[in-house]
């Protein structure tokens, strides 16, 4: 399975450091945030990761590339622990990148992956949202898709005020199929969704958080939507159209 990681954002909330360092490369403990995303995808069985980037993001690709000179120097110096860290990229899924020429929204970013993904279902991981490694969220989402088919998105319980910054969803609880590692009450069908609604239009206490498993039909849907919230092409509008939501 492919994973698409939109990574073209400017990171304005982290200025001034993001003038020269991609926000995805900012450290979380001892490694860049983007490594946690690729590790999460790999741990869920994904073998191919596509970064959707822009100019100035070359450091992301470089981080997951071989550097034979450094590896040889570390080996020669007997710095085995450092060499092990440097070589961790070899354990991860293959990585690729494509440019998003214009910042026209998340839906537009996902469209840039169409030729790479082809006609297969794929995952989307938003690098701003880091998950607890032990949660196995993506693996559980794959279980849901295998059991029920269709597209799967992750939901987060939020306050009404917080919901105005997310895609707010109307939901109905579903029974959990055998073989899916969820508790009763954790599996829901989305019956309505609104991107960043005003407070009086929040649909429930559940909002979409940055993990998706999508059918390739979403590409056709994204090609036929109008700009939404913020004048951008929203992924929310694309998958809502794909599954027939108003």
PLM feature segments, named:
Residues 45-46, 118, 147, 189:
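Short loop/turn motifs at secondary-structure junctions
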């Amino acid at each position: 399975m492919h994973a698409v990681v939109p990574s073209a954002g400017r990171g304005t909330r982290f200025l001034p450091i993001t003038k020269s360092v991609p926000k995805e490369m900012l450290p979380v403990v001892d490694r860049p945030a983007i490594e946690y995303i690729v590790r999460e995808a790999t741990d869920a069985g994904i073998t191919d990761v596509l970064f959707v980037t822009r100019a100035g993001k070359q450091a992301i690709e470089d981080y997951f590339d071989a550097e034979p000179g450094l590896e040889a120097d570390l080996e020669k110096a007997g710095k085995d622990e450092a060499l092990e860290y440097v070589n961790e990229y070899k354990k991860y899924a293959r990585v690729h990148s494509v440019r998003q020429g214009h910042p026209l929204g998340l839906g537009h970013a996902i469209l840039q992956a169409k030729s790479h993904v082809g006609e297969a279902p794929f995952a989307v991981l938003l690098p701003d949202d880091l998950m607890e490694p032990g949660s196995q969220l993506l693996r559980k989402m794959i279980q849901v898709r295998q059991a029920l088919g269709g597209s799967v998105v992750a939901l987060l319980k939020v306050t009404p005020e917080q919901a105005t910054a997310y895609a707010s969803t109307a939901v109905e609880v579903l029974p959990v199929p055998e073989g899916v590692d969820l508790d009763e009450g954790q599996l829901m069908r989305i019956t309505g969704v609104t991107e960043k609604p005003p407070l009086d239009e929040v649909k429930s206490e559940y909002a979409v958080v940055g993990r998706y498993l999508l059918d390739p039909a979403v590409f056709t849907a994204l090609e036929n939507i109008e700009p939404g919230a913020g004048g951008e092409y929203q992924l929310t509008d694309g998958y809502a159209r794909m599954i027939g939501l108003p």
